[in-house]
Amino acid sequence: MKKIGHLMKYLIVSGDSNTTADFDSISHPDMDFSYKKWPELLAEKLGMKVINVARSGQGNEFIYTTLRDEIVKIEDKSQIGLVIAAWSQAPRKDYKQEENPSFRQPWPWSSIRIDTHGNLPYWVQRSLGYYLNFQILCERYNIPYVQFQMIELFEHYLQGILPDPIDVHFGADPNSQSKYPGNKKKDEGSILKMILEYEKKLDTSKFMGWPPVKKLGGWRFRDQLDIWYDNNSPRRVSPLDCHPNGLGHIAICDKINILLQEYKIIKE
């Protein structure tokens, strides 16, 4: 048990729809998703109290910013047992709207799937910066931390974007695929070089799967389980929805717990 006297330490986690406690599915609006998600399950294994600020559809600016805000909010940093960043896709653009007194929003953050400014190499560079910012922040306060790329960072955009579940729900052809707008070979080479250069700046012993690209010999967390690849996996919501179900979140929790021990983030 990770405790301060009689108090449990905090496990702080941020990510996207594969991590949020408030997941729902447009493909299955009547399905019950009230089961425990992996951050809560992991906190129970580690004897910690979870703070899960993940939200569906969000990108890496959101993930970094919400983790930073939770960390600085806690005055006694010794109360923080572990912080986990489960990174999302680089092209996503996050933005925050100030609360309007005449219209109370339940959540100030929103996002768009593809940023309308910049290009793929820039978006990846921006995400690499968030990796580094997160590391520097945790080192500044001497907080135990780990990070990993939960889903693909950029490859999906390079290969051509498929419609998201919302588009498919409203009639888009699920097999239609957009064409990459840039020079695919040149941009991929630039991105891979950029990622390798960041290896000199990051503490990769605390970045599980580094480098987060299969072509460079690393992995994304989605490569570790069949949830995202096998349409008939018993651990995903359905063939239509590749998100983890209750069994999937248990599998994610168990795998992360094993990796935390392998990377010596926590003791066995």
Predicted regions and their residues:
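Serine-esterase "nucleophile elbow" of acetyl-processing enzymes
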Residues: 5-66, 73, 251
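Alpha-helical cap/lid subdomain in secreted, periplasmic
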Residues: 4-5, 68-268
